[in-house]
């Protein structure tokens, strides 16, 4: 079997202008970035706002193994298969962050014969969105520090600056830094730090904004610091929201690419799901829904993180709610949740599948709480045995959830035909009665308690000393009616990454809150979740290179 990049490089791509014709996008509607990438114009986005909205399919997963469970691959393969059975379909996905590409993942554009292309471009600099977001974020930092240096008219307490710089890399050495060192001409010394770009609030804002004016409004509402009398300082106080919007005026336009099978794909925005809301842009998803009859999108990590945030944070900003939720499961992950070590996952173990099924079952029941029909997709691997597959299908049947085996990585669209037909049938025969998990009027404590007890299966929520102080502060500032974005490990329902399966007897501790008032949600930090990842001992970058003819190698 060829590697992902070998498969991608063997495909004869069609010009993107030709690909998008099938969904009614003309040459004058796009802004080309070479032959195979383009951005959708504002004029076209506005022109389709009044069109009929299609069906929305959300792809999520069980709690993943460190290698991931193939959500993006399954999303792409499902969309290709839906097109093959005659459903006019588009994909709306996140764009990768360069940090994880160089770190563990080595790439994030699907895999095998279910990829979005050109994968080298998408995984590296793409159309420059990440750089624009990084620049906007750091321009804000520079302008903020300059304000303090040039007299500090707003009386900003330099000890209470909460806005951090960002870089689109995994770089643990930058988590805590001191800026302004040297002579007085270098600014006022203060503690600072770097987050990874995809954790920036500006990334979240870009992904939730509905148009340029909404983008500007959200940017103006970012809290960057507090004054010496403890009042929040907003971007609008610095009067720089116009400049930040200018930097992002092209980045907000969704990117158009294609799959191996020629399915049009909108790949735009990329917040992490463990430290941010984990969904691609509202603008891309909303536009796709008006261009196609079916739209496949995904939310990061397991359903306890990405899907919960999609349904409670993103969906209220969309023109419709999901018509079906597809939960991706792998037998290797179920066996890991059933107590099997990573080294033994390739060995048949039906008992472990049964034990690990509790994780999938909880995710299915959780998604049903939102009133949306659920389908389970088994992402097939070569080590899966017939006994294990049959066992999993029986277990799914016992809880009355539709289940299909899919081999889209190996077989492309053909490997997802049965899944596509089942998903289409579910949408056509079952109605979605979407409802949020909590109400805006609920307090911050009430919202978090509902997430912890109803989604995670936990007992109680504890608030650390800093979080307790912030609860009153946020209420006084009028921030308590916003949705909650839980920052939690992706490997477990709990805040302990080693507590696998479907644990029940555990509590969650919130150590700190971060106001994302521009994006419109509050981040609750739990466990040891970091907003700037580090690199592994042997980063994927060690295997990357470029040949003399410019061909990339080592991306996967």
Curated annotation (Swiss-Prot):
Pathway: One-carbon metabolism; tetrahydrofolate interconversion. InterPro entries: Formate_THF_ligase, Formate_THF_ligase_CS, P-loop_NTPase. The keyword ATP-binding applies. GO terms for biological process: tetrahydrofolate interconversion. The keyword Zinc-finger does not apply. It is an enzyme of class 6 (ligase). GO terms for molecular function: ATP binding; formate-tetrahydrofolate ligase activity. This is Formate--tetrahydrofolate ligase.
């Amino acid at each position: 079997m060829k590697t992902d990049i070998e498969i991608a490089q063997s495909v004869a791509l069609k010009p993107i202008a030709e690909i998008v014709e099938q969904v009614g996008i003309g040459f004058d509607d796009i802004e080309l970035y070479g032959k195979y990438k383009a951005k959708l114009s504002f004029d076209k986005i506005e022109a389709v706002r009044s069109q009929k909205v299609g069906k929305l399919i959300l792809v999520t997963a069980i709690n993943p193994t460190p290698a991931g469970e193939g959500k993006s691959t399954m999303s792409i393969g499902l969309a290709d298969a839906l097109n093959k059975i005659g459903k006019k379909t588009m994909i709306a996905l996140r764009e990768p962050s360069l940090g994880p590409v160089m770190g563990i993942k080595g790439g994030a554009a699907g895999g095998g014969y279910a990829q979005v292309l050109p994968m080298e471009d998408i995984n590296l600099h793409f159309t420059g969105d990440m750089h624009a977001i990084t620049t906007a974020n750091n321009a804000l930092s520079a302008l903020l520090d300059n304000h303090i240096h040039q007299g500090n008219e707003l009386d900003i307490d330099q000890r209470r600056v909460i806005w951090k710089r960002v870089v689109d890399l995994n770089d643990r050495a930058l988590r805590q830094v001191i800026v302004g060192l040297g002579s007085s001409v270098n600014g006022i010394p203060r503690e600072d730090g770097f987050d990874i770009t995809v954790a920036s609030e500006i990334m979240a804002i870009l992904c939730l904004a509905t148009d340029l004016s909404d983008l500007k409004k959200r940017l103006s509402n970012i809290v960057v610091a507090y004054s010496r009398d403890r009042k929040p300082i907003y971007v609008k106080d610095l009067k720089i929201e116009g400049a930040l919007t200018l930097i992002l005026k092209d980045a907000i336009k969704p990117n158009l690419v294609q799959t191996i099978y020629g399915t049009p794909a909108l790949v735009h925005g990329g917040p992490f799901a463990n430290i941010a809301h984990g969904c691609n842009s509202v603008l891309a998803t909303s536009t796709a829904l008006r261009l196609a009859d079916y739209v496949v999108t995904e939310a990061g990590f397991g359903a306890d993180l990405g899907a919960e945030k999609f349904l409670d944070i993103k969906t209220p900003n969309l023109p419709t709610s999901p018509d079906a939720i597809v939960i991706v499961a792998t037998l290797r992950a179920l066996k890991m949740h059933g107590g099997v070590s990573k080294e033994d996952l390739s060995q048949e173990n039906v008992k472990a599948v049964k034990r690990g099924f509790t994780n999938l079952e909880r995710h299915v029941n959780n998604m049903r709480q939102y009133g949306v029909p659920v389908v389970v997709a088994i992402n097939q691997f070569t080590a899966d045995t017939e006994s294990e597959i049959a066992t999993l299908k029986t277990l799914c049947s016992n809880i009355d959830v539709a289940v299909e085996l899919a081999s889209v990585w190996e077989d492309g669209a053909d490997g997802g035909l049965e899944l596509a037909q089942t998903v289409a049938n579910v949408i056509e025969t079952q109605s979605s009665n979407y409802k949020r998990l909590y109400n805006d009027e609920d307090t911050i404590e009430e919202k978090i308690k509902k997430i912890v007890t109803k989604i995670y299966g936990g007992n109680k929520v504890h608030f650390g000393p800093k979080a307790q102080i912030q609860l009153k502060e946020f209420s006084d500032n009028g921030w308590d009616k916003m949705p909650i974005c839980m920052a939690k490990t992706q490997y477990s329902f709990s805040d302990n990454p080693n507590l696998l399966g479907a644990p029940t007897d555990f509590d969650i501790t919130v150590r700190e809150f971060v106001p994302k008032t521009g994006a419109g949600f509050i981040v609750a930090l739990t466990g040891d979740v970091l907003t700037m990842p580090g690199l592994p001992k042997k980063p994927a970058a060690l295997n990357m290179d470029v040949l003399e003819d410019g061909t990339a190698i080592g991306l996967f």
